[in-house]
Amino acid sequence: PYDQAMEHGIPVMEHRIPLKVHSYQQDMMTVLEIADEFDIDVTLDHALGASDFVEELASNPHVKGVIYGPIYIGLFPGEGCKVDFDAMKMLDDAGVNTAMMTDALLSGSQMLVNQVGECVRAGMDPIRALRMLTVNPAKMLGLEDRIGMLRPGMDADIVVFDAMPCVVPKA
């Protein structure tokens, strides 16, 4: 029988978009097993505790990205996870497409740059860290030909800072 609610899964099953999976440390290996079993692409969203699974995330062809955060809010009951800023550098170094998220309604979108700054403080190159806010998310969505870079013909919203915002928070 026809079920309209199932239509949302068609682009995922046809590999046109990844399935966005809310996941923490305790869920990540299960997400990878499901992605492999059903041959679907995924992004792991939130991903606190990802430093425990760098090799697995980097080697799985179904992982289209890891979107980390937010880091400045409390966890829900039962979701005791480690906040591992170094995970983003480790994943980036391993070739995983990484991005940063805030859950803006809970933590505020202004925290995005501060969170990227924490990655820089943990050793990530500032330019690579800024890519987590620009081209990397565009690649996860398959939109890198339209957004994510300042280049002729691309769509962009531009913010000008007087210093590197992930290095100088008051920029």
Labelled PLM ranges:
Residues 64, 69-72, 78-163, 169-170:
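His/Asp/Glu-enriched, well-ordered alpha-helical/loop segment
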Residues 2-84, 99, 139-141, 162, ...:
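Active-site core of metal-dependent hydrolases
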